[in-house]
Amino acid sequence: MSERKLFTSESVSEGHPDKIADQISDAILDAILAEDPEAHVAAETCVYTGSVHVFGEISTTAYIDINRVVRDTIAEIGYTEAEYGFSAESVGVHPSLVEQSGDIAQGVNEALESREGDTDDLSHIGAGDQGLMFGFAINETPELMPLPISLSHQLVRRLAELRKSGEISYLRPDAKSQVTVEYDEHDKPVRVDTVVISTQHDPEATNDQIRQDVIEKVIKDVIPADYLDDDTKFFINPTGRFVIGGPQGDSGLTGRKIIVDTYGGYSRHGGGAFSGKDATKVDRSASYAARYIAKNLVAAGLATKAEVQLAYAIGVAQPVSVRVDTFGTSTVPEAVLEAAVRQVFDLRPAGIIQMLDLKRPIYKQTAAYGHMGRTDIDLPWERLNKVDALVEAVKTVL
């Protein structure tokens, strides 16, 4: 009897309370970067019934209308009706932002290496905090992501498309998905075992109608038929009713969906959130760099699965460690891959910012449906432009 393994990941829609908070934080970041690419931003958001609080630390020459940014973001998500208990024009907006701590700024603005005489411009910026970050890639999908999180994201994106187009008129913005994939003894995905979808809806919609529409127009549209069989289980709004949702149902906070944002639990996570942070915060930029490295390693055929860990000390430019784990799938020793990575990628914060062009207002679009593996938008850390360089670097190391 072959060994049966199950793995589950989840995603949430743009109308989920925590994702509303993420999108507001990143909309503020983008608005600031559009005027001041050198700004340092750490913007946190809390949302609940009828109210939005924005707080954190910002150092910038830009002036932005935070009230307008917040309301526009909420409207774009779809909270435009007072009956939702949270709407763009009636919500209270309460900003409380201060300047970044001078103690932190001195280490970011002039790294330890620069203070000790290193004249390289890319050694000038120090890491905005200590910490460890992970990036991951696997050959389960064309975008080199784990299948469970890839399908979970696609399901809630499809729900949003049907809601915004009006094709399913009773849908409201809040939704969640969860997909359980069965793997064979070789760790290859063979079928989808369980799909869970909870979607907010108008009170008039019936459970039978919701179930039929979600299965036919969402699940079967997203999940390839080869993965579905008579034993696949569908749980559609299993509580029986989901009218009260969004911030009226639960409060939301920036940074509470870090597993949804990355690999759905399939890879390790360093614990740092992304949204609302400029690229001097290595929680964000180094996580993107680690994904960039891992994806190019797998695309180069150097491994079928790769996890990259980077770690930093606050105020220091060079990473304190670089680790590559291929789980026994690499074609060369992992020490060789680590040496090649150090040759090809400049992993100082300024090097990452330059390599991935991270001073641009590109972040709001990442704040829902995943920061990694996106095929609907062009993100620099998803590009496969280091494949040849990695292959050549491996040859020189060997």
From Swiss-Prot:
Annotated GO MF terms? ATP binding; magnesium ion binding; methionine adenosyltransferase activity
Q: Which residues bind Mg(2+)?
A: 18
Q: Does the keyword Hydrolase apply?
A: no
Q: Where on the tree of life does the source sit, at the highest rank?
A: Bacteria
- UniProt keywords, alphabetically: ATP-binding, Cytoplasm, Magnesium, Metal-binding, Nucleotide-binding, One-carbon metabolism, Potassium, Transferase
Question: What PROSITE patterns would the database entry show?
Answer: ADOMET_SYNTHASE_1, ADOMET_SYNTHASE_2
Q: Which cofactor does it need?
A: Mg(2+); K(+)
Biological process (GO) annotations held by this record are: one-carbon metabolic process; S-adenosylmethionine biosynthetic process
**Cellular compartments annotated:** Cytoplasm
Specify which residues bind ATP according to the UniProt entry for this protein: 16, 174-176, 241-242, 250, 256-257, 273, 277
Its biological purpose is as follows: Catalyzes the formation of S-adenosylmethionine (AdoMet) from methionine and ATP. The overall synthetic reaction is composed of two sequential steps, AdoMet formation and the subsequent tripolyphosphate hydrolysis which occurs prior to release of AdoMet from the enzyme.
Q: Any idea what this protein is called? A: S-adenosylmethionine synthase
Name the gene for this chain.
metK
